[in-house]
Amino acid sequence: MEYAAELHRRNNSPLRARPVTRNLGASPRGELAMHAMAVEFPQVHGHPNRLPFEGVLTMVDVASDKAPSGARGHRVVLTRAAAEAALPSLLGMAVDYKAGWDGHDARQKCGIITSAELDGKRLTVAGFVFSRDFPEIEQRLGTDGAMGMSYELAEAHVADMRAQVWTLTQATFTGAAILLRDKAAYRETSFRLRHTPWRERMAVQAAALRRST
């Protein structure tokens, strides 16, 4: 996790954000609570620079396994209410990675988040990595199942700064990092590509070239 001082502002976009809601039967008012949201991109089959991914970004209402970067040595809890309120801020945010896969580098943006969902205690995300621009990512992640994720925040509010475990009651997501799972503050995070791995795709393309010559 990484905390930033500035707040990322959303801009106007022709892309549509699609919320998914469920009815709270226990609520006397029958209120609707958002638990998922997605940005609908036009489908482009075989796009050379869009490689779908999915992952578990963090856990909600659960203390982190270790202190994240910027938390001054404190483990943290992101409340479900805070995560739900901040869900729209994840859409359109970048995913990044750091050489060594052990932290954050917000300047090394390699993909985009297009959907986010609260599934029980898991906050899951999906989107695209820019596989043509960053071929090393597909080569690395297409053959490794040990990857996780870590969120980046701005304007995080802590309920009690004196507490041993900080409870985050409000925040804005500004991005996420792909990193080794054992380097993430939460061990239960995950990251995986949802497409044919790079080596297999290269083999298929090479076979097609041989057939055409």
State where each predicted segment sits.
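A broad, low-specificity signal marking well-ordered, structured residues that form hydrophobic/aromatic
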Residues: 51-55, 93-95, 123, 149, ...
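Short low-complexity stretches enriched in small and charged residues
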Residues: 74-85, 101-110, 130-135
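Residue microenvironments linked to proteolytic maturation
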Residues: 114-206
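A glycine-biased structural micro-motif
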Residues: 73, 86-96, 120
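Short conserved beta-strand and strand-loop elements enriched in small hydrophobics
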Residues: 89-103, 149-151
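Short beta-strand and beta-hairpin "edge-sheet" elements
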Residues: 19-41, 100-121, 159, 164-181
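Generic structural motif
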Residues: 44, 56-65, 81, 98-100, ...
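Polar/acidic, low-complexity leader/linker segments enriched in S/T/G and N/D
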Residues: 1-88, 201-211
